């Protein structure tokens, strides 16, 4: 019988102060006899609440810890320190968290999309941390700009549009006049029938998803969002090796990534890359997915690995 876990993420969230920045951290204790420590790193346009369902689900295998990333989930951005949210800075931040939180303990790392990109860069910059990792899981992650399968026109529009809005004045204008709840709601409603996050939702579910999208757009720093978009679209981590095997959860028909190319790049970086296809076809679970909704997303093989002592 599965133990009872609160469905309120606030019951597991605590303050976090790292590298001069205030944020939050989610920690769900595992079952008494499970000693595994799992570090969950969320991706782009995310928060602790967005991945709470996944954290709930995998906490059956051990204690799950998920920190905010600077500029995401309401955490103060690197700009407060006069720094940019570069991939290296994010990797350094994550390394500091791992060293502080886990010290000499072993850790399982699961990185979601951009979160896996950050985790990979951390392991490249801090190879000593790779020795602490017992299992490394990429959850629809990527490591190179060519992993994306956007059309060239769309790629260039996102690449240079994001670069423009990562500057202070354009970002301020967007935050002040564009990212307003009524306008966000109107935009999502107008494209709901063809938007991948919305089209399968009924009226009540659609409202819940849009309301949560509004929260995400409000709690994520717009400059950080845009600057990290540029980092993702220009990434190339294939120049340094990591002495670890990686298990990559892929989804069939991923609308963002070419799974074959992702696998090739993972094999360039890691000692071994094994692709395990999820039963779920979406790039990520819905933004309000519960632990029960998440369950089909994590393949049985990954579950068996996590279940081992």
Provide a role label for each language-model segment.
Residues 215-262:
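Conserved serine/cysteine hydrolase catalytic core
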Residues 130-171:
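Flexible "cap/lid" loop of the alpha/beta hydrolase fold
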Residues 66-112, 129:
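Active-site loop/oxyanion-hole signature of alpha/beta-hydrolase fold enzymes
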Residues 21-77:
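Conserved HGGG/HGGXW glycine-rich cap/lid loop of the alpha/beta-hydrolase fold
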Residues 56-57, 245-281:
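Conserved loop-alpha-helix segment in the C-terminal half of the alpha/beta-hydrolase fold
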Residues 269-309:
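Catalytic active-site module of serine/aspartate enzymes centered on a nucleophile-bearing elbow/loop
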Residues 1-38, 59-62, 102, 289, ...:
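Alpha/beta-hydrolase fold catalytic core
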Residues 111-119:
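Gly/Ala-rich beta-loop-alpha elbow adjacent to hydrolase catalytic centers
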